[in-house]
Amino acid sequence: MGNLYALILGIIEGLTEFLPVSSTGHMILGTTILGIDIDEFWKSFLIIIQLGSILAVIFVFWRKLFQGLDIWLKLSVGFFPTGVIGFFVAKYLNALFNGWVVVGMLIFGGVMFILIEFAHKNKQYRINSLEEISFKQAFCIGIFQSLAMIPGTSRSGASIIGGLLLGFNRKVAAEFSFLLAIPTMIIATAYSIYKEPELLSNANSLIPLGIGFITAFVVAVLVIKFFLKFISKFDFIPFGIYRIILGFVFFYLYYSGILNAGSEFKL
């Protein structure tokens, strides 16, 4: 993988990991357009740039993370259902690794955002700070997050939708989603390395790995800060519309044969 491609994929990862638009869908698009082979080094590269994204969340929210034990307990409770469900259903997920599933979930998630925003129009939110989130609500968010195991759903999208349905205001829903990404992504990455320890031994081209890591970190920091400011003033409808448009783009690419709904998707 060349340095320029590493830079581009790092940007894609940083831009889409925490926006509710499906980072998986964008990585499919990016690797296909760039003509990158999905080999062992690519898998190692993906792990490294995801670590950059995780570090970005810690960097942005470090004050909240060190305010006390309460937030860590809530994140642990939130991760629990995702971890349990993931452990038991992971081996059955290959059946969902299909481009048409991505299409369906992109469009479905977009419609959900639009419907929820219309339903919440002029309504008062019940939860307006992280401190007000109950352990029961944190657990429910974890259940929603587990839906992101379905390709095209978006981890942040699923958990944010869960928060909105539970009465969180937009900013709190997004903040808890971002914070919940820390244990979720760290453990998911560790599990990937445990299953395929050779992935680290394949990471022998340090320059593209470093470029991807730093780029993903910097872009993710900027995106998180921008996103939180954006949703403090606006709603999620633009993201819903974007998801629907992207879903139809994928529909066209798969239907026309430009992309293979099976093999092209298996990242």
Swiss-Prot record:
Q: List the disulfide bonds.
A: none
What InterPro entries has UniProt attached to this entry?
A: UppP
Lipid bilayer topology: Multi-pass membrane protein
Q: Which reaction does it catalyse?
A: di-trans,octa-cis-undecaprenyl diphosphate + H2O = di-trans,octa-cis-undecaprenyl phosphate + phosphate + H(+)
Q: Which domain of life is it from?
A: Bacteria
Q: Which residues form a coiled coil?
A: none
Residue intervals passing through the bilayer:
1-21, 41-61, 69-89, 96-116, 173-193, 207-227, 239-259
Give me the Gene Ontology terms describing cellular component. Answer: plasma membrane
Q: What is its EC number?
A: 3.6.1.27
- List UniProt keywords, sorted A-Z: Antibiotic resistance, Cell inner membrane, Cell membrane, Cell shape, Cell wall biogenesis/degradation, Hydrolase, Membrane, Peptidoglycan synthesis, Transmembrane, Transmembrane helix
One MF term in the entry's GO annotations: undecaprenyl-diphosphatase activity
The question of whether Membrane is a record keyword is answered with yes
| Miscellaneous section | Bacitracin is thought to be involved in the inhibition of peptidoglycan synthesis by sequestering undecaprenyl diphosphate, thereby reducing the pool of lipid carrier available.
Q: What does this protein do?
A: Catalyzes the dephosphorylation of undecaprenyl diphosphate (UPP). Confers resistance to bacitracin.
* Listed NCBIfam families: PRK00281.1-4, undec_PP_bacA
Q: What protein family is recorded?
A: Belongs to the UppP family.
What is the name listed in the Swiss-Prot or TrEMBL entry for this protein?
Undecaprenyl-diphosphatase
The gene behind this protein is uppP
